[in-house]
Amino acid sequence: MIQVEMQDVNKWYGAFHVLRDINLTVTRGERIVICGPSGSGKSTLIRCVNRLEEHQKGRIVVNGTELTNDLKKIDDVRREVGMVFQHFNLFPHLTILENCTLAPIWVKKMQKREAQEVAMHYLDRVKIPEQAHKYPGQLSGGQQQRVAIARSLCMNPKIMLFDEPTSSLDPEMVKEVLDTMVSLATEGMTMLCVTHEMGFARQVADRVIFIDAGQIVEIDEPDAFFSNPRHLRTRSFLSQVLH
């Protein structure tokens, strides 16, 4: 089953052409890793999937719903698409448990007790149930990012988007977040992940996409992508990020 379909997608920021003729199909359970230099359009691409960014040309269909200016359709898609950002975006004045139950209660109209049970299940899933009654400021960066993942999972998404989820973390915290994402991948979650963590890409990706100057330059399975990239721009990029 196709979960995300992008056809000839283009986007501009004023005169800047940030996405150029993007064509991409993602099937259920597929893990896609998107890499490329800074400013290449990686984050914009995945932010278009849940309409955090609006494309100006082409079609984007998510779980059978085409993204247009219809606000109800946008809301329907966002209920099914979880997103984890570079910065954790947790509410500092709410406890970890309250951060995780807010959307299920207000958006899905879930009863508080049920929402708390779901939240504790996913906090346990990301291995920090003991932090439930603390506030975000009391947690490490890695713990906060795992809370952000749990919070997204509480909405029972069909697709997870990750926008450089480890880039603002100290090196010793990166592994704990990547381990959580690897675990999600092994359970069959459909994932689109923007990251420079090439070891993660090798381990979990079904396909790796290299994007540069708003264009998909190369897309391939990890073994072929890393061992025999076809394009000079891909080879140049990999020579810089693989140490």
Language-model features: locations:
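Absolute protein N-terminus
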Residues: 1-2, 243
